Amino acid sequence: MSNNDQKRDEGYIEKLVQVNRVAKTVKGGRIFTFTALTVVGDGKGRVGFGRGKSREVPAAIQKAMEAARRNMIQVDLNGTTLQYAMKSAHGASKVYMQPASEGTGIIAGGAMRAVLEVAGVQNVLAKCYGSTNPVNVVHATFKGLKAMQSPESIAAKRGLTVKEIF
């Protein structure tokens, strides 16, 4: 369960969030496999997460990285922070994220911190409630980031100017 594993490949920042060993009991004993949860981002608003399973740890991590690259979304950031405060949930995990002023840094824990770092968010206040299962926390964080829209995109959808919205 390392959160510090970070590589730069093709302009993407890759982080390993979790490695888990699981066992399947069969007639002859136990079969051990490994699952990996990774997040990938470009540091400019594009971010993705993936899960991989294999009998070997490196193969599971590689599969997770490939899945994360296929599962990328674009996040509308307001400079180095979020557009507005938001709540999101997945399963029993609930996350709350709010924009922070310049120089605050990423105040978030565990899996949520990894997602926000690779997405390019540099100033944010975040809290996780309920279950802290890394898989569900990453899902909840992604739901929140995916739902976030910039005022410009909302104005364009409504056919108004940004000043008319506020």
From Swiss-Prot:
Family annotation (HAMAP family): Ribosomal_uS5_B
All copies of domain S5 DRBM, residue ranges: 12-75
GO biological process: translation
The record's note on its domains: The N-terminal domain interacts with the head of the 30S subunit; the C-terminal domain interacts with the body and contacts protein S4. The interaction surface between S4 and S5 is involved in control of translational fidelity.
Function: With S4 and S12 plays an important role in translational accuracy. Located at the back of the 30S subunit body where it stabilizes the conformation of the head with respect to the body.
Pfam families the record matches: Ribosomal_S5, Ribosomal_S5_C
Gene3D superfamilies: 3.30.160.20, 3.30.230.10
Species per Swiss-Prot/TrEMBL record: Pseudomonas fluorescens (strain SBW25)
Family to which the UniProt record says this protein belongs: Belongs to the universal ribosomal protein uS5 family.
Keywords: Ribonucleoprotein, Ribosomal protein, RNA-binding, rRNA-binding
Name of the gene: rpsE
Entry GO CC: small ribosomal subunit
Name listed for the protein in its UniProt record: Small ribosomal subunit protein uS5
Subunit note: Part of the 30S ribosomal subunit. Contacts proteins S4 and S8.
GO molecular function ontology, one term from the record: structural constituent of ribosome
Classification via InterPro entries: Ribosomal_Su5_D2-typ_SF, Ribosomal_uS5, Ribosomal_uS5_bac-type, Ribosomal_uS5_C, Ribosomal_uS5_N, Ribosomal_uS5_N_CS, Ribsml_uS5_D2-typ_fold_subgr
